[in-house]
Amino acid sequence: MAVILDLVVQGLQMLLVLLLAPLLTGLVRKVKARLLLRRGPPLIQPYRDLARLMRKEVVLADNASWLFRVTPYLIFAATWVAASLVPTFRTGLLFSWSADLIAIIALLGSARFFLALAGLDVGTSFGGIGSSREVMIASLAEPAMIMIVFTVALIAGSTQLSTMAEFLVSSEVGLRVSLGLALVALIMVAIAENARIPVDNPATHLELTMVHEAMVLEYSGRHLALIELSASLKLLLYLSLIACLFVPWGLVPAGAAAGMLAIGIAAYMGKLAVGGSLLALFETSIAKMRVFRVPEFLGAALMLGLLATLLLFVSRSL
C-alpha cells in the first residue's frame, strides 16, 4: 500500500510541475507588466500560446537533419524528468534515490548540449551565435553549480535532495555564512541558466545580443511548443531547487498522512508565487548587461561558491 501511495505521489508531482510551469511564466510576465504600469497578458496566456503552437504545422529547413527533429523531444524529456526529481511538496518520493543533484545537473547539461547542436545544425548565423554563447555561459555556470552542490553536500552529508532538505529543515543547521553565499551563487547561476535579465532577455527575438532565442529561431509548431514548455519547466526547476535547499519549510515528510499533501502543495505554490514575483521585480529594476560582461557575472558566482566552501572548511577546523 505504501508503494502505491508513493507511486501516486510521484505521478502527482510530475503532473503538478508540468501544469504549473506555464503558469509560473505567466505570473512573471503579469507582475512585470504591473510593475511597469501596464495591464499585461492574462496568467493563462502561456497555455494558449502552447495550444496554438501545437496546432500549427511544423516547418523544417531543407538541410535539417534528424538531430534537429528529435532535439525538442529530448530537451523536454530531460527537463521534465529533472524537474520531477526535485522534492516540491513531499520528501521521500518513489524516485528519491535518483534525485541526486549531480544527476539533475547532468540532465540539464545533456539538454543544453543537444540544443546547442540543433542551433548549429541548420547553419544559420543566429543559430551559430546563440550556440557559441550558450556553450560559453555553460562553461562558466556549471563549475559554479558544482561548488554550490559541494558546499550544501558537505553540510548535509549527501547529494540526494530529500536528505538535504530533511537535514536543512532541522534545527541542527543554524545560521551559516557558507549557506548564504551558496544561495546568492545559486540565484546568479539560475538567472544565467534560464536566460533571464541581466544575462539575456527572454522577450527578444531579433536582436544580436540574444542567446537562447537565437538557437530556436528555426523551430515552429509543436517543436517550438516543446522548447517553450521546457524553458518554463527549467525556470520552475531552479525555483523549486532554491525552495528545497534554502526554504525547505512546508515540505511534507515521508510517511505523513495523505491529507498533509494539500498543505505541502499550498506551501509549494506560495513559494513559487513569491519567487516569481521577486524575479519580476528584479528584472524590472535592472538593465541587461553586455554579452562580454557575462563572464564577470558568472565568475562572481564561482567565487562565491568557492568562498562558501572555504568558509565551511575553516569553520569546521576551528
Q: Where in this protein do the model-derived segments appear?
A:
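Juxtamembrane/interfacial segments at transmembrane-helix boundaries in multi-pass membrane proteins
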Residues: 93-97, 151-181
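Interfacial loop-to-transmembrane junctions
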Residues: 278-304
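Alpha-helical transmembrane segments
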Residues: 9-20, 96-109, 172-193, 263-264
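Mid-bilayer segments of alpha-helical transmembrane spans in multi-pass integral membrane proteins
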Residues: 84, 103-118, 139-156
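Juxtamembrane inter-helical linkers in multi-pass membrane proteins
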Residues: 37-54, 201-223
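Cytosolic juxtamembrane amphipathic/interface segments immediately preceding
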Residues: 49-68, 125-129, 216-223
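Transmembrane alpha-helical segments that form the membrane-embedded catalytic/substrate-channel core
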Residues: 23-31, 110-119, 184-201, 273-282
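Juxtamembrane boundary at the C-terminal end of a transmembrane helix
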Residues: 308-318
